[in-house]
Amino acid sequence: MKAARLQVIGTVAGLIGVWAMTAGGCANEQQKRGQELYAHYCMHCHGESGRQNEGFNWSSMPDPKPKDLSNKSEMGTFKDEDIFNTISRDMKDTSPGGDKIGDDDFAVPTMPTFKYTLSEDEIWSIVGYVRTLHGMKLEFKVEERKKELAEGLKTAQEKFESSKQAYEAAEKKASEEAEKKSAELKKDVDVDESAYAKEQAAMAQAKKELDAAQVTLNNFSGRPGKGGNVARPDMTATPDQAAQMAEVGKRLYQNKYGCNGCHSIAGEGGKVGPALDRAGFRLNATWVYRWIKNPQAMKPETRMPALGLSDADAKAVSMYLSTLRAPKAEEPAAAKPAS
């Protein structure tokens, strides 16, 4: 009996050990992936250890500079969700008269969003790695989040099927009533669409919710911009229209999308991406539009994130870049040989 009890205890202990190793392995894998993503997308500004003035681009960036991610006294005040939301927010126009910015909104244009570049799971991996830079661990239950999304999709599917059945039943009833009246009056009677309008609206709403739930679940594991080609835009505009768009684009370039955090003009700005002084000579406006709408569709491993530009914003920024036509830098004069 005692031997049997010991065998059971040993089996349970073994299972717990396997579970712990599996959980630990998942955590280690997540941290490793987060470190790789951080190195690719974040290190040039935030530095290898998250310290200020450590990344090669840090000193070139306009104020406010990137936070010290190694500072536990400050970073410890943020929840995991706060860090996630900072990395995956929508960009805000910080210009006077621009977007409304709430007290809790993070609105630093030079910190890009990765909402349209990385999967939700990948962003959580980055959050987990950032936590290690100030000696903390990710507390957010990522796997539970995935299960919730799967359950949400299942619920949305059931709701859609139910609303579809209700719509079809109401439409059938209205059609049968119209046929009955046609037979009685011996003339065609139109179906009363208002009789099933409520069910039709409910079905349409349920379909929207189903589509949204499907996209959210897809984006949890898959990158949102992968494989999404951008259609060629119509960039035709009168000179006055082009000038107005370029003026808007100049504002968006700096105050909404923070392009100056990575690119320089006239020596001012970041040095992650190429200088844009002569973009008007080097780059075609149509190509620029497609690139800034979805860089990953054109170059999957580029460090430049997709920032969620609307069509209008992408046209405006493209028009602004087309106006940048600085003269070529003069070649340094050859040194004269000593006489």
Give short role names for the model-derived ranges.
Residues 41-49, 91, 134-137, 296, ...:
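A generic secondary-structure signal for well-formed alpha-helical elements
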Residues 51, 258, 298:
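Conserved helix-loop functional segments at active or binding sites
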Residues 29-48, 84, 126, 227-229, ...:
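Sequence/structural segment immediately N-terminal to covalent heme-attachment motifs in c-type
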Residues 47, 54-57, 96-98, 137-143, ...:
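Short, solvent-exposed loop/turn and secondary-structure capping segments
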Residues 1-30, 128-247, 318-339:
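Post-cleavage N-terminal segment of exported redox proteins
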Residues 15, 23, 72, 112-115, ...:
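Generic anion/oxyanion-binding catalytic loop in active/binding sites
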Residues 59-131, 219-222, 261, 266, ...:
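Extracytoplasmic electron-transfer domains, predominantly the class I c-type cytochrome c fold
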Residues 21-33, 43-74:
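Accessory recognition modules or surfaces
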